[in-house]
Amino acid sequence: MAKAIQEPTNPVDPVEAYLNLDDDVLDGLSDGDFLAQQRLLLETERVHYTEQAAQLRAEADSMVQNNEPAEVQFDEESGEGGTTAIDRERDLALAGSALAAIEEVDLALRKMDRGVYGLCESCKQSIPRARLRALPFARLCVRCKEGGLPRSR
């Protein structure tokens, strides 16, 4: 009796596998393979931030609809008089951050299309692959991000 071939129960997520590559393996990828992996990573990030922004806006809108001003108690016992407004503002701020990240991702994808992805906007040198993998929409190399080398005294 022949054994049936079993499909893996936990298929490997290609983005997760890429994120777990050793730096030596990452540096050994061809430019084309590296850019293809980065594009996949950026597109995955875009989906994540889009979903996050939509969820946070929906939660903020729900707070407004579910908590009419007449229902809010401002006594010492409830202790929740201002928390709805604070929670809503927090959700809106986080949604704004997610939307800003989407803009950064879109810019990185446009740079990829123009052939300038991975170049530091300040010094025009290549941003290390490990930094781009960690922050795929990085605009600056670490040196420029930190403001250059400190002056000696």
Predicted regions and their residues:
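Short functional micro-motifs and their immediate structural scaffolds
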Residues: 110, 127-128, 149
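Short Cys/His-rich "knuckle" micro-motifs
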Residues: 130-134, 151-153
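Cys/His-enriched microdomains
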Residues: 118-121, 139
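Short, cysteine/histidine-rich loop/knuckle motifs that typically chelate Zn2+
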Residues: 122-123, 143
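Residue-level signal for mature regions of secreted extracellular proteins and peptides
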Residues: 113-116, 134-137
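Cysteine-rich micro-motifs
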Residues: 138-146
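Residue-level signature of catalytic and energy-coupling elements of molecular machines
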Residues: 42, 123, 132
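Interaction interfaces in information-processing and related assembly proteins
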Residues: 2-114, 152-153
